[in-house]
Design a protein with these regions (language model features):
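N-terminal cap/lid segment of alpha/beta-hydrolase-fold proteins
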Residues: 1-26
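Short, surface-exposed "cap/lid" segments of acyl-processing enzymes
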Residues: 20-77
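Catalytic nucleophile loop
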Residues: 37-38, 58, 67-69, 110-121, ...
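Alpha/beta-hydrolase active-site loop
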Residues: 84-104
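Alpha/beta-hydrolase-fold enzymes
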Residues: 104, 108, 112-113, 117-205
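Short beta-strand/loop motif that positions the catalytic acidic residue
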Residues: 216, 222-224
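Short alpha-helix in the alpha/beta-hydrolase fold that links the catalytic acid
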Residues: 218, 231-242
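Catalytic active-site module of serine/aspartate enzymes centered on a nucleophile-bearing elbow/loop
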Residues: 248-290
């Protein structure tokens, strides 16, 4: 999708539509659902090279599944201003363009599901008022309220942001945390938000987003994992409970009847997630599929 929205005409976003073999062009594929990956990864988070993942499962359950990839990730090419990409730009320009494109193709507005940073992008689009007509959205291991203790020291945040800006991007393979890079703009947004006196806001205007989060009305499924050390459950739950619209929460842990305390990645990926988590997500989506 080349949407020509916002600064820079070079932006193109890859949207991959997943379907069952034998489905004819134009045939009703069911209720559309968009999956948004987190940082340092791509659509492979939802669909493995062997064709298995939450994406293929939801297709089998009758949903019309689309995979959204951030700028410069997977099949989305790098734009000319790659190092200055931000969550705000994704939320303000890319998600609304994809939302409208899917509506044009399917005749329905999709539900959006995001993991970690993917959830933050969706939450920013909703709180910023950039994307409307959503039937529902879900977030997995997403929060914007946990203070990063290393960044609470005065000047730690500005120094870290200066170093990241100098590097222009962080290499996920070099850091052994994923197959993709992240631009300085996205990293610095995170550092500013979680530093001393930081808050969730739009960098371009300084507008605080939590007040709008508290007044939003789209139905939310907030999923947290009891064993998550990246975005701990208590912070995800705190963020979800601030939301003003209809919401359901799901804590993936032994105390709630699950086989284990799920963690940040295996809440989505693996046989345990396939058996215990994916069906819950499918059932929740089914309520909005009419």
């Amino acid at each position: 999708v080349k949407h020509n929205r916002g600064p820079g005409p070079s932006v193109q976003i890859a949207l991959s539509r997943i379907g069952l073999a034998g489905k004819e062009q134009g045939e009703d594929r069911g209720f559309p659902v968009v999956l948004v990956h987190g940082s340092f990864t791509n659509k492979g988070f939802w669909l493995s090279a062997k064709g298995r993942g939450m994406a293929s499962y939801l297709v089998e359950q009758g949903f019309d599944v689309w995979l959204f990839e951030h700028r410069g990730h997977g099949q989305s090419p790098r734009n000319d201003d790659y190092q200055n990409n931000t969550v705000e730009r994704y939320a303000r320009f890319d998600l609304p363009a994809a939302h409208e494109f899917i509506h044009e193709q399917s005749g329905r507005y999709p539900a959006w599901l995001g993991h970690s940073l993917g959830g933050t992008i969706i939450a920013t689009a909703i709180s910023g008022g950039f994307m409307t007509s959503l039937p529902a959205f879900a977030m997995f291991g997403t929060q914007v309220v946990r203070p990063n203790m290393a960044l609470q020291v005065p000047l730690a945040g500005p120094i870290a942001r200066a170093l990241v800006s100098f590097k222009k991007e962080l290499d996920g393979r070099q850091m052994k945390i994923g197959p993709e890079n992240e631009p300085a703009g996205v990293i610095n947004e995170y550092l500013a938000r979680h530093s001393l006196l930081g808050r969730w806001k739009l960098p371009s205007t300084g507008e605080a987003l939590l007040p709008k989060w508290k007044s939003a009305t789209t139905p939310l499924l907030g999923v947290s994992a009891a064993g998550d050390t990246t975005d701990p459950a208590k912070y995800c739950q705190r963020f979800y409970r601030m939301y003003g619209g209809p919401k359901e929460e799901l804590l993936l842990g032994v105390e709630n009847g699950f086989s284990k305390d799920f963690a940040h990645i295996d809440m989505i990926i693996g046989e345990d997630a396939e058996r215990e988590v994916w069906p819950r997500v499918s059932n929740w989506l089914g309520a909005y599929a009419s």
